[in-house]
From Swiss-Prot:
Induction behaviour: Expression is negatively regulated by H-NS and subjected to cAMP receptor protein (CRP)-mediated catabolite repression.
SUPFAM superfamilies noted in UniProt: PapD-like, Periplasmic chaperone C-domain
Residues spanning the signal sequence: 1-26
Annotated localization: Periplasm
Recorded GO CC terms: outer membrane-bounded periplasmic space
Stated name of the protein: Probable fimbrial chaperone protein ElfD
Gene3D superfamilies tied to this protein: Immunoglobulins
GO molecular function, one term: protein folding chaperone
Biological processes, Gene Ontology terms: cell wall organization; chaperone-mediated protein folding
Entry annotated with the keyword rRNA processing: no
Keywords of this entry: Chaperone, Fimbrium biogenesis, Immunoglobulin domain, Periplasm, Signal
Organism for this UniProt entry: Escherichia coli (strain K12)
Gene: elfD
């Protein structure tokens, strides 16, 4: 799914629109697409890579990339090369991401975000105005330590659910970040939610829910949904 939030400023001489999007080769007709919807950086790897594609037939883009922490601050613990480059029409390039920070938690994943901003070349109109549309794609980056007790594929079935009069609590006893999709409580659709390792999330019982039973899917390392599961108590 591709979602965008538009932040725009219009002036007499310049229209600047900043779009913040999540995409995987999802640029459509002319634009910038990424080769993944999420990245996994396994402990011990020297670097990982992310493909960037310009699907426009005639517009070059200036590409700038960085890694952010969950509180939306740039992380100094990662280097991305090249950090700034021009991506010509109908071309691709690889971003190489290297971790250079201090050791991270050994018993669980650590979450970061990879941000890729694309600014097209300027188009001048006859009346002298300039139109610029900049896109910013942000995807999750999971740093995964060695030696976790079991692989990610076994984690979704380990979620546990408890209920009270008007609340349902989903607990994640695993060392992985788990994103719940196609989430239903009592047969009613609930907004997707990511639960951190060894954490829990409380959902209000949806109006009209038949009961407090929970069914869900999750997202794997490749951005695909896993089979549906019934949450156990």
């Amino acid at each position: 799914m591709k979602t965008c939030i538009t932040k725009g400023i219009v002036t007499v001489s310049l229209t600047a629109i900043l779009l913040s999007c999540s995409s995987a080769w999802a640029a459509g007709k002319g634009g910038i697409g990424l080769a993944a919807t999420r990245l996994v950086y396994s402990e011990g790897e020297e670097q990982i890579s992310l493909g960037v594609r310009n699907t426009s037939p005639d517009v070059p883009y200036l590409i700038q990339s960085w890694v952010m922490t969950p509180d939306n601050k740039k992380s100094a613990d990662f280097i991305i090369t090249p950090p700034l480059f021009v991506l010509n029409p109908a071309n691709e390039n690889l971003l190489r991401i290297m971790y250079i920070g201090a050791p991270l938690a050994k018993d669980r994943e650590t979450l970061f975000f990879t941000s890729v901003r694309a600014v097209p070349s300027t188009t001048k109109r006859k009346e002298g105005n300039t139109l610029k549309i900049a896109t910013q794609s942000v995807i999750k980056l999971f740093w995964r330590p060695k030696g976790l007790a079991y692989p990610l594929g076994e984690a979704p079935a380990k979620l546990r659910c408890t209920s009270s009069a008007d609340m349902v609590t989903v607990s994640n006893p695993t060392p992985y970040f788990i994103t719940l999709t196609d989430l239903k409580i009592g047969g009613k659709v609930v907004k997707n939610q990511m639960i951190s390792p060894f954490d829990k999330y409380q959902f209000s019982l949806p109006k009209g829910a038949k009961n407090s039973s929970v069914t869900y899917r999750t997202i794997n390392d490749y951005g695909a949904e896993t089979p549906q599961l019934n949450c156990k108590s």
